[in-house]
Design a protein with these regions (language model features):
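A general structural-boundary detector
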Residues: 2, 19-22, 40, 86
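Active-site phosphate-binding/coordination module
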Residues: 28-112
């Protein structure tokens, strides 16, 4: 694939987009700006809730130049410029008690 064919750049946050201090370095910012200038859609991907990612999206200017947030480990995709939910998939609440009981039986925690 040639670079001109790249349309989307999806980046995990912690340790990928940000460094050990949870900071986006100037070099990374410049690379993101260059990609966006070429029409590449920047997607911030995380297991965090949307509200936990939006401040970084705004800091990077994705609310103005476009981009998306992929939150809840892929459970939601939000357009940063409009706030529109492009995709949402939720677990039906009726399954939660059964899943919690199973997790307790297995001695594991449920991480969302």
């Amino acid at each position: 694939m040639e670079k001109k064919d790249i349309r989307v750049l999806a980046l995990d946050l912690d340790g990928t987009l940000t460094n050990d201090q949870k900071v986006v370095t100037p070099a990374t910012r410049a690379a993101l700006d260059a990609a966006a200038a070429k029409g590449v859609t920047i997607v911030l991907a995380s297991g965090r809730p949307t509200a936990g990612i939006m401040p970084l999206a705004k800091e990077l200017g994705l609310d103005k130049k476009g981009g998306c947030i992929l939150s809840y480990n892929g459970g939601a995709i939000i357009d940063c410029a409009t706030g529109e939910t492009l995709y949402r998939k939720q677990l039906d609440a009726k399954y939660v008690p059964q899943l919690c009981a199973f997790a307790r039986e297995q001695g594991v925690a449920i991480v969302t």
